[in-house]
Every structure is written in C-alpha cells, then in structure tokens.
C-alpha cells in the first residue's frame, strides 16, 4: 500500500504523490512568540515532527520549513506592558520554544525563518496582488479583496454570503468588504515599522507565511500543515493571497492536527484549564508526553488528563521493561530452554515491519502502529515469563527488540536506554514521595543487614513501612532495588 494522507482541501484520503519524485516540500505554521507554549503547541509540533521523520524513513528527501511569527499585535502588546522592545519579547520566547521542542525530542526543521527577516519578500507579494487587482491600499493599510478571488473559502467550505450577513463594517472602517483582510498595517505610535510603498508599517499575519513558504519551497509545494484552528482564517487567507499572486496552486496537501481537550473540556485560559509545556514537563517525563501525544490519531481530539498521562507513563514503562528484559536475557547467554520456536513471537516479529508500515501509510496512524508495538511486547513478555528465552527464541527476542527500537527512532520514542529511563521515572516519582531517595537507600541497607543477622522481623517491618509509602522493593541475586508503585 502506498502512502495515503487526509487532505483537508478535498475532505478525503488521497494517495500521496509529491511534485518531484523522491522529494517532499513541507511548510508548517510556527508559533507567535509572545508567551509560553501550551500543550496544544506541543501536539502540533510533535505531530509534524512525526510526519517529517516518517517521510524520511520512507526514503524521501524532505525540506521542512517551520516559521516564527516574531512581530504581531500580541507581541507588541506584551512589549508595551513590560516596557521593553518588541524583539526582546520575541527572542525570549523563541529561546523558550526551542528548549521545549528539544525536550520533546523534535528534529530541527530544514529552515526556521523569522517573519521580521523576510519583510522584503512580503512587500513583493503584496505589490503583485495590488498590480493584479486583488488588493487595494487604504490610507497606509493594504487589504486583500476576497470578492475578487472566486475560490475563496474552498478550504474551510464556508459560504461568503452567509459570513457577510453576520459581519458588520464599523464606522471609519477602511475595508470594502467585511471579510477583506489586512496584508499591510500602517504604523501606529509605539509600534515597530518598516518602510514600504504604502508608508511605514508592518505585515499582516497571513502574508508572512505565504512569503516565507514561497521563498524556501517555491510557489507550489507538497504539504502545508498546522492545527485545525488555523483552517480559517489563516490557511484560507494564505491560499487566497498566494494563488492570486502566482496564478497557480499553492499547496497540494493540507494536513491539520486535532485539538487537545483538558479533562474532556476545550482548553482555555478563561476556564482555568490551560497548561504550558513547561508546567507539564515539571510533572511528567518529556518522552511520556510525546508518547501520549502519539497514542491517538493525529486528526482525532485527544483528552489531556492526569489519568491519561499516568496510563501513557505506565505503557511506556511496560515497553521499556520488555526491552530491559530482552537485554538481560541476551546477556545471560543461551540459558533457558525452547523445545521449538515460539510461533506467535515469530509471526509477530517477522510481520511487524510490514504492519507498522501499513499503519503509517494509512494517514500516519500512530495509534494503530503503537498497538502493533504492544502486540509484540506482549508476545515477548510471555516468552520471557515462561522461561523460553533460549534456543531459537533468543534470536527472535533480539529481533523484536531491534524492531521496536527502529520504529521508536521513526516516532521519536524508545530512544533511551531502559535503565536510564527507569531511573528518570523513579527519580521523578520519588520527588513526590514523603521520603527521600537517600532515606530509602539507608533503609534498604539496614534491611540487608537485618536479613544477614536473621532479624527477619525487622527486615519485614522495613519492607512494609516502605510499601506503605508507595515503594516496592525488588530482591534479586544481584541485590535489592526499589521502584515507586
């Protein structure tokens, strides 16, 4: 099966055929850098990082562009509130965004352009739109005339007449039509500005992405992505101004990720259920958050809650536990018996790459792909649990481990050493306990001494006391370790 993607423009899954065989051009709208990034931003960026990784895994040479909107009303307002230059705000939050994305394991895009470094390109596109009659200047501002672009609203499938009926042009408004949108905004006192044929001012939001995508990917490219909230007006307006300026299709495939809900409610600052990436990563491991975000199909809404994050944490811990178990089995040599090859494990291991590819080729279905990972994990755990890790099964277990690792590299998960992940998780959980790690280790040492002195009553008291605090002791020939329940 060849790769099929859901195209918002057509409303159907389509076979993916890039403009240039073997090469993919992809533009994804980046953040407006005026505040801390929230988990909605995390989802969008993890989703398109996954797509970027999978396309490369599939053999494509991918040019991936993700911009920074570093001049905007929100940035200017915050700068004025803090009494600092607008670029002090944008640079601060660009640095924070980069830290968040690095923590989530994102690969760097090919290009990360800033809007303020591409003003000349924006002015050029606006000038072409005016020359072609699709835009008009009005007292220092420039607007796009939506009535001149017949296919307007083809992405969002809205009706212009109905939208006009619900709109009102305020007194003094410069627009000819309520839905006309700004390409250039005349300067106001206290705002940054650039020189232009229409006077000093700054670009509108929508023209920024059109100009930057054209510069790095050309007038027509393969994939344009972003969150569903960008379909209208941002992406709709991008299509209008780009296709009007160039007279050719803008992007062939429009891909949009679904929303993040908080405890089944829409995430909103007004509802008080707004979480930044930084806040979430103070409580959960970054790989757990990434695993959670990939556990649902990218177009489906995903419900963010402590319960769901804990379940994702447990699932990831289970996979790492299997990888650790396989590693331990392999280091023991050919111990264990296997009268015959475990057929279920053999079938799951052999067919796994093909099943993974089929899931991902079906509109990047990470939920199904991870389901196949858990199928393989269950089979491997059963073989290990039954003590059948020797003989031909030893090679099958190694194959299962390597294949889980390989798809993990594609998805950006399972990239840690199992012991390192377990230690990270243990330390994070231990920070919430009513006892320090040092005190736990001291009690373990005391318990070992008590057992050596055959003081089993004291040893049991220590074990029970730690259990009451949520700590499980694990005794083995190599010694005693602990984990948080």
Curated annotation (Swiss-Prot):
Its cofactor is Zn(2+). GO terms for biological process: cysteinyl-tRNA aminoacylation. A motif ('KMSKS' region) lies at residues 266-270. Zn(2+) binds at residues 29, 209, 234, 238. Binds 1 zinc ion per subunit. Pfam families: CysS_C, DALR_2, tRNA-synt_1e. It comes from the Bacteria. Coiled coil: none annotated. It catalyses: tRNA(Cys) + L-cysteine + ATP = L-cysteinyl-tRNA(Cys) + AMP + diphosphate. A motif ('HIGH' region) lies at residues 31-41. Its main location: cytoplasm. This is Cysteine--tRNA ligase. It comes from Geobacter metallireducens (strain ATCC 53774 / DSM 7210 / GS-15).
